[in-house]
């Protein structure tokens, strides 16, 4: 115990944590998670391929059990679990994981549905043909070898690859404090980019992108936009969006549309994708899908999504793109080990690092070839000398009592050059090995043999003494001199060295190059999508139930006076058109919600539908939250100076904000007005700065004031008081009066009246205002007020779901301070909850039909005769 105590050294825990964690982090970064920029391999990939190479598990030989390879890897090179090694092998054998597979697998290696591979005892593997190019010239001293984990084996520090594997197959890894995510690319394009760099090392990133336009994924699909690619290639970091390749097919007979998905984004699990679509349909977050099935087979992928009759296939597909992994983002983070250190590298730096690596590999290979050629030439010189001096050499050997004395005799004297003097003198300098001392070789017209040369002469077989063999020796020597001259040219000329690299890259491209799979398309990030949209005037309709659509304005043809006109959309009987806007397809629709938020929508983003179609729910087009509803929609073409957005809340707060404050759209919406708890936005309108504003309260009060009484405020301001409310009173309507129309006011018990705008006096802001309609027990509270003309129609809705539509001309015109007359008789527990001016035009026959179906009898909707009490005005 005392001996153990003497071996324990107290340390500061903070210092130990720093030191140990740093060691661990560097071990993970360098030895596990990040690829080398030169060969694009992590250590485990490199060790697997090297083990297969040592085993002779070549592409043109028999498969070997995966377990055999795994055993060799973990036993010799990779002292970790077998699962990590086998998972690496599986990934290198999956056609949907690697753009160019490095392992040729036989058996079950998983699927794009996320199925696991079979156990390693069942599957068999061998190297793919292209994997051999990663280890080409490995035996030619092209790379350094290092000890394995226990010093009993040697493994390559890096592969002498001819394949630019880092870009071709990409890499993914999470280290400590950093990660890498490099997408795969097309081999032909990557080699073209490297060839362009070899020709001009000053080439720009833009120049390289002419050859390498972007990633090329094994699962194909489509990349939306080039900006993310450009950013990643320029800085080493960026984001690209990959969407599935899908098409919308229409049945020629029924007209029903079907979405067919042929390709999905990289690394997306197809089974989970289908489950997610089904879940969204079940939760009604995506509408318009009637059936979903997977018809994929060995010939390819095919996901079939059947669209309902009243749905638009392209709209459904766009919703799926936005809510599922039919479209995903791929974050590019090109981190690799460069000179043993992690570094974020751009496209040019990665290409330059590979070319430098190939330059070193070719140089080292050439040096070895030169050394071997000179050694062989040295032996051929000795054999040529022996043939030129055959008789004296044979005599010397015959007289020598032992081989050692014969060798010593050969070395001790000089030899005539004979008939090979010209050949030997021509190749003396080029073919002379670097290790050869000056006293050996050709000197003073004589030849002096080395010990190695003397041994080669003693080993010479008698058949080599024939004349034919003599000629072969001379021919081989001449070929070696030519080879040595070429090798020296490669080592002495940078241009020739790069030419060799270029020739080898071209050979790889010719042998393994293929066509691009992934298309790259421009999107709204790169171009202005409005340039692709035809400008035309359209009619946008939004129903009370929240269905929106547009139709070309030409669908509403001009009619002679007295004509029947075209019927409006026949939607559901309990629904009606709430808002009708005439706008241009390039206009922006500002959508304000009850929670004071603003959302943007371009008119061309609204689905186009026929007259008889309902359109699409606006909640599918805007990211509205639960219990959030739209309050107002306003069309805006240009954010002109002097135009304001005027807002009013239920608590009587008003706010005026310049329209250009809302000129920068955000996909998630923005806060248009800050609301106090329990408050909500009830009305929004555009003003010119010279308008007047009217606020109507549930207690029958109205205040009319000039717009300039409210100063312009910033987007996030709360606003100021517009009307002074008493007790539980609240604002129900905001009106910016325009023209000489009348104000129609309605109460919850079905009473209504029309009053000229001129009868409402202009007062100061923040006052109680004047009476707009007398609120009594008979009338009930005010539910709303609208400005109308004689030709308009209105719709009243009750909490029991009853809708009554009536012509405005049938509502009596009375004074401001009156109770009004009955418009709709409600049941005992039934109240009117909303009043809305109907936006769409209809003919008289249709109006009568709607009125007849909505009311139990004519007497229920016929206005009562005005009584003296009804129209008698009280003093204010």
UniProtKB/Swiss-Prot annotation:
Record EC number: 5.6.2.2
The keyword DNA-binding belongs to this UniProt entry's keyword annotation: yes
Stretches with biased composition (Acidic residues): 856-876
Domain Topo IIA-type catalytic: 34-532
Chief subcellular location: cytoplasm
Annotated stretches, region: Disordered: 844-876
Reactions accelerated catalytically: ATP-dependent breakage, passage and rejoining of double-stranded DNA
Function: A type II topoisomerase that negatively supercoils closed circular double-stranded (ds) DNA in an ATP-dependent manner to modulate DNA topology and maintain chromosomes in an underwound state. Negative supercoiling favors strand separation, and DNA replication, transcription, recombination and repair, all of which involve strand separation. Also able to catalyze the interconversion of other topological isomers of dsDNA rings, including catenanes and knotted rings. Type II topoisomerases break and join 2 DNA strands simultaneously in an ATP-dependent manner.
Family statement drawn from the similarity comment of this UniProt entry: Belongs to the type II topoisomerase GyrA/ParC subunit family.
Subunit-level organization: Heterotetramer, composed of two GyrA and two GyrB chains. In the heterotetramer, GyrA contains the active site tyrosine that forms a transient covalent intermediate with DNA, while GyrB binds cofactors and catalyzes ATP hydrolysis.
Protein name: DNA gyrase subunit A
Organism: Klebsiella oxytoca
